[in-house]
C-alpha cells in the first residue's frame, strides 16, 4: 500500500506512468477501441485492460500523478474528432469531452482539448507508449495524453 495513490490504479499502470518519458503518449481508450490490435504496435507492446472503470475515472486518478506537456505541445490532451457523417447528422459534442475538460482543469486550468481525425488517432495510438482500454461506453470516449516533465 502507498499513500495518496488512487486504489483503482493497479501496479502495472503505475509502472507504465513512471516509465514513460517526456513526449511519450498514453491512450485512455473506450470499450469500442481496437485496443488489442493497436496495443501490439505500441512501445509497451500489450494492452492494459481496466474494464471496470470508465475513462473519466482513470483520468481523474492519474491527473495529479501524470504531468502533461503543456510547455511544448499545443494540445497535450486530445480526443478523437467526430466523423464527417456524425457531424452531418448533427451529433452534438460528446458528453465525455466535457467530463475530461472538467477533470483536466483541476490541474491545468487553461487546458484546451485538441481533436484528431479518427484514422489519424489510430495511427498516433500505434506510436503511443501504451494503450489502457477501459469500460467506457460513451461515444467518442478515447483520449490521448502527452507526458510532460516533472519540475
Model regions: which residues?
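Structural motif
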Residues: 24-27, 45-47, 69-80, 111, ...
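Glycine-rich, aromatic-bearing surface loops/beta-hairpins
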Residues: 81-151
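Conserved active-site and cofactor/substrate-binding residues in soluble primary-metabolism enzymes
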Residues: 4, 8-12, 21, 53-57, ...
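Intrinsically disordered, low-complexity coil segments
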Residues: 39-44, 70-74, 85-92
